[in-house]
């Protein structure tokens, strides 16, 4: 097997075993060691909790005021009927919700096939039993189906309902995921001389509203879209911050008073409009000696003070004075 030791193997879809119309086993290999569990667990969590689908959210049954009751002529109590309604597998085409109706009379089972609905609604499990009638009794109900994602308990929706919610409208815990069961297994795989690789086998059962293969494809798409944000991190470059050096030595921006010259020397400099040390160092000895009342003694004092600070007379400063000082002058 050729390639860099740091290069990751790219898995391929090896086999799709269609166990039944709603169950399939999907095998992918080879995976780098440890990636079987990494990808298997991520896909499993998405398939169970993040896949969009349709579920029953509300039910109204004629003659029933609350879920903790029973209905004459029906074998099951209301809680059991609600539990059975949660098992309906519904497909909505081009809409996010629909109202279904069910009316049945006479002894026998009541199934999903007895539900009346529009043409853009499909029930994938028409043989699903909702309840059983005894004797010459009947049952009528209205069932609301909505599109959603994940699991939404009835208690969470009840908090958002208005206080004037009609008596008899029963809220149902909604599990929107079309995946009924998902399990994965990691087995050993081999490629040429490498025997430390993984094989991922995903065993999944859906409620019939989506093919198992399509469910895995959608879950992988969701995972890839979420990881896109991390991929983009490699393109974000932090600009290198260059240390900005000051245009002039800070000491040149200080006033000449900081030199602590004698009063005579300081007054002579101020008379010549020499306010900053940067102004002073640009003057030559000849220029300073032409200053009224500034003799050789004062000149020597100025030269010694500047020398103690690493400065001297006759220096050339480009772009002097800086804008910050020019505004003050």
Curated annotation (Swiss-Prot):
Q: Where is this region: Alpha N-terminal domain (alpha-NTD)?
A: 1-234
- InterPro entries from the UniProt entry: DNA-dir_RNA_pol_insert (IPR011262), DNA-dir_RNA_pol_RpoA/D/Rpb3 (IPR011263), DNA-dir_RpoA (IPR011773), RBP11-like (IPR036603), RNAP_asu_C (IPR011260), RNApol_insert_sf (IPR036643)
Catalytic reactions of this protein: RNA(n) + a ribonucleoside 5'-triphosphate = RNA(n+1) + diphosphate
Q: Which GO terms describe its biological process?
A: DNA-templated transcription
- Listed GO molecular functions? DNA binding; DNA-directed RNA polymerase activity; protein dimerization activity
Keyword Nucleotidyltransferase in record: yes
Give a Pfam family name. Answer: RNA_pol_A_bac
Q: Fetch the CDD domains from UniProt.
A: RNAP_alpha_NTD
Q: Which UniProt keywords apply?
A: DNA-directed RNA polymerase, Nucleotidyltransferase, Transcription, Transferase
Q: NCBIfam families under this entry? A: PRK05182.1-2, PRK05182.2-5, rpoA
- Similarity comment text for this entry: Belongs to the RNA polymerase alpha chain family.
What's noted about domains in the record?
The N-terminal domain is essential for RNAP assembly and basal transcription, whereas the C-terminal domain is involved in interaction with transcriptional regulators and with upstream promoter elements.
What is the recorded function of this protein according to its Swiss-Prot or TrEMBL entry?
DNA-dependent RNA polymerase catalyzes the transcription of DNA into RNA using the four ribonucleoside triphosphates as substrates.
Assembly and partners are described as: Homodimer. The RNAP catalytic core consists of 2 alpha, 1 beta, 1 beta' and 1 omega subunit. When a sigma factor is associated with the core the holoenzyme is formed, which can initiate transcription.
What is the name attached to this protein's record? DNA-directed RNA polymerase subunit alpha
UniProt source species: Shewanella amazonensis (strain ATCC BAA-1098 / SB2B)
Gene assigned in the entry: rpoA
């Amino acid at each position: 097997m050729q390639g860099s030791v740091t290069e990751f193997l790219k898995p391929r879809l090896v086999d799709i075993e269609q166990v039944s119309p709603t169950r399939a086993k999907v095998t992918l290999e080879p995976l780098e060691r440890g990636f079987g569990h990494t990808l298997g667990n991520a896909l499993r969590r998405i398939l169970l909790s993040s896949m969009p689908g349709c579920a029953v959210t509300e039910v109204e049954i004629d003659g029933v005021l609350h879920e903790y009751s029973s209905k004459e002529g029906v074998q099951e109590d209301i809680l059991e009927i609600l539990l059975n309604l949660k098992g309906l597998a519904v497909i909505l085409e081009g809409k996010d919700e629909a109202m279904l109706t069910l009316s049945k009379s006479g002894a026998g089972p009541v199934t999903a096939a007895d539900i009346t609905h529009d043409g853009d609604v499909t029930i994938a499990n028409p043989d699903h039993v909702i309840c059983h009638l005894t004797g010459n009794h009947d049952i009528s109900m209205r069932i609301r189906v909505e599109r959603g994602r994940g699991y939404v308990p009835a208690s969470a929706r009840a908090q958002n309902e208005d206080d004037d919610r009609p008596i008899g409208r029963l809220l149902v815990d909604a599990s929107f995921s079309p995946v009924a069961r998902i399990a994965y297994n990691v087995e050993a795989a081999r490629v040429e001389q490498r025997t430390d690789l993984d094989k991922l086998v995903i065993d999944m059962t859906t409620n019939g509203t989506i093919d198992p293969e399509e469910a895995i494809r959608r879950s992988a798409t969701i995972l890839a879209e979420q990881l896109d944000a991390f991929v983009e991190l490699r393109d974000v470059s932090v600009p290198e911050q260059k240390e900005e050096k000051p245009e002039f030595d800070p000491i040149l921006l200080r006033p000449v008073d900081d030199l602590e010259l004698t009063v005579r020397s300081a007054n002579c400099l101020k008379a010549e409009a020499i306010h900053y040390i940067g102004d002073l160092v640009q003057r030559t000895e000849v220029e300073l000696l032409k200053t009224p009342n500034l003799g050789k003694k004062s000149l020597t004092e100025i030269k010694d003070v500047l020398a103690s600070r690493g400065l001297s007379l006759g220096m050339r400063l480009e772009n002097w004075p800086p804008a910050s000082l020019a505004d003050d002058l």
